[in-house]
Amino acid sequence: MTSWAAIFLLIAMHTILSGAEIIRAENTNASPTNQRRAHGNACGPASLLNAFHYGSKRWQRAFNAVPGDDSKTRINYVISRWGLKPSKHIEGVRRWNQQGINLVDLQDVANEMCDYHWLPKIKYEVLTRAPDEAATTLLQRSHQRIVKSLKKGLPPILCIRRYAYRNSKELKTKSWWPISAHFIVIIETTTTLKNSPNSYRIKYVDSYGGHTHEGTIHTSSGSFTNSPFLGASLPSATIGNTLIKKGEATTLTFSAVLGRW
C-alpha cells in the first residue's frame, strides 16, 4: 500500500468512525516512554513500560515499581534487571541484545515484572491466517484480542514487521523478506467491526520518539500476494525505512499481539 493510499484510508476511517463507539486505555494522561533516550533497539522494554503506564491502576503498579524519573533510567533498569537474563527459548543468548528482543522473551520479561505485584499472566498470539481462514476472520480475531486486553486494563502490544520484495541469493528469485520489526502499544480502537469489516482504526504509542499516532489495521496485503498477515497502515511510522533499497516494494504487516485475554 502506498503512503498516499494509507493516508486516504486513514481519512476514510475517520469518516466511518464518526458514530462508532470507542474503547480507550484507562490512563490516557500517561506520558510516553521514549526508547531513543536509551537505546535505538529498546522498543520491547519501552513498550512494556508504556503498556503498564497507560493501563489501569493495578497494571500501573508494574510501571511505578521501576525506579527512575525519565525514559533512559527506566529502560536501562528493565534491561539490566530482566532483559539481560539468558533466553529460555534461544540457547546461548540473552533476552535483549543489540538486535532487540523477540516476542516470547518479551513475554517472559513482562510476566516477571508482573509477578512482584500479583498481576495475571500476559499472553501472546502470532496472528497468521489458517489455510482456510478468510482475511476478514483473522481481522476479527485480532480485533477481539485488542479489545479484550483493553477491557482488562492492559493496552496490548503489537508486533509490526516491514517486508521488502527483494532478490534471494539462496533461492535465486525475488520474494518477500522481513527486514525490520517494531513493537507499538494500542491505546484506542473501535469496540466492534460492524461498520467496517475490512479494517479498524487504532491510536497507538510509538516508543521510537515517544509519540502517539493513528493508523489502521486492514485485510489488504497490497502487492504482497498470499500474505498470511494483516496489513498495517501507519503513516507516521519509520519502521525499517533506512533498510529499504531504491525502487523496492515494501509493506507493513501486523504479525503478533501481546496482552491479557
What are the residue ranges of the model-derived segments?
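N-terminal secretory signal peptides that target proteins for export/translocation
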Residues: 1-2
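Bacterial N-terminal signal peptides
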Residues: 5-15
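Active-site-adjacent structural segments surrounding the nucleophilic cysteine of cysteine proteases
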Residues: 15-115, 247, 260-261
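Short, well-ordered loop/turn elements at secondary-structure boundaries
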Residues: 37, 151-154, 198
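Generic hydrophobic, helix-prone segments enriched in Leu/Val/Ile
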Residues: 78-82, 138-150, 252-261
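Predominantly the structural core of cysteine protease catalytic domains
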Residues: 90-190
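Active-site signature of cysteine proteases
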Residues: 144, 161-261
